[in-house]
């Protein structure tokens, strides 16, 4: 997705407000191309009198890779920004919560301490014991629906998809 500085800044401000006070933030793990929002979110937290275990007292903003099993992969140069660090997970869109679940598993695997979960859009309010703080919800999009392939009423009727949407954008078919 192309990004607009002003929109990303406003989303970061709203997410910061929704997350509220967090004692420690060392790292923001950005999924789905949310690095610009993540940088602004880090800036919002740094304005507070917030503690960090980072020596330089600034927040890391990192993005993982995904392996062939859709598991998070942090390279050796990124691992120190996760291991033993207080982490906020940030995603663009959360529909089922599966990506958040896998991401939380991955962050824990690499030794991170999850402090908060945020998503620009989410139909899920909680995942693995963490509130999912979001700017937009399903109620904000009249007629919004998401289905698994097995339960899709359009698929059952043979109605073809118009487009595919993911973290990179949408493509008409």
Descriptions of predicted regions:
Residues 94-107:
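A phosphate-binding catalytic loop at a beta-strand-loop-alpha-helix junction
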Residues 21-34:
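Short glycine-rich phosphate-binding loop at a beta-alpha junction
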Residues 1-6:
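Short, small-residue-biased leader/transition segments that mark boundaries at the very start
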Residues 30, 89-90:
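Hydrophobic Val/Ile/Leu positions in short beta-strands of Rossmann-like dinucleotide-binding domains
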Residues 19, 45-49, 107, 111:
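Active-site catalytic pocket residues across diverse enzymes, especially alpha/beta-hydrolases
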Residues 35-88, 95-98:
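Short, glycine/charge-rich flexible loops or terminal/linker lids adjacent to PRPP-binding catalytic cores
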Residues 15-23, 78-82:
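Glycine-rich helix-loop-beta junction characteristic of Rossmann-like nucleotide cofactor-binding loops
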Residues 104-173:
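PRPP-dependent phosphoribosyltransferase catalytic core
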């Amino acid at each position: 997705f192309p990004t607009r500085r002003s929109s990303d800044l406003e989303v970061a401000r709203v997410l910061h407000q929704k997350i509220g006070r967090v004692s420690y933030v060392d790292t923001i793990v950005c999924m789905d191309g949310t690095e610009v929002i993540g940088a602004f979110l880090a800036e919002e937290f740094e304005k507070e009198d917030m503690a960090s275990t980072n020596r330089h007292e600034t927040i890391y903003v990192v993005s993982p890779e995904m392996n062939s099993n859709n598991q998070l992969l942090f390279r050796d140069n990124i691992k120190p920004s996760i291991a033993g660090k207080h982490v906020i997970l940030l995603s663009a869109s959360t529909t089922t919560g599966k990506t958040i679940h896998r991401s939380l598993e991955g962050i824990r695997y690499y030794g991170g301490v999850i402090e908060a979960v945020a998503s620009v859009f989410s139909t899920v309010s909680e995942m693995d014991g963490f509130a999912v703080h979001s700017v937009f919800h399903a109620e904000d999009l009249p007629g919004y629906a998401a289905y698994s392939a097995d339960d899709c009423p359009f698929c059952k009727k043979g109605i073809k998809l118009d487009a595919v949407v993911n973290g990179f954008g949408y493509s008409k078919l």
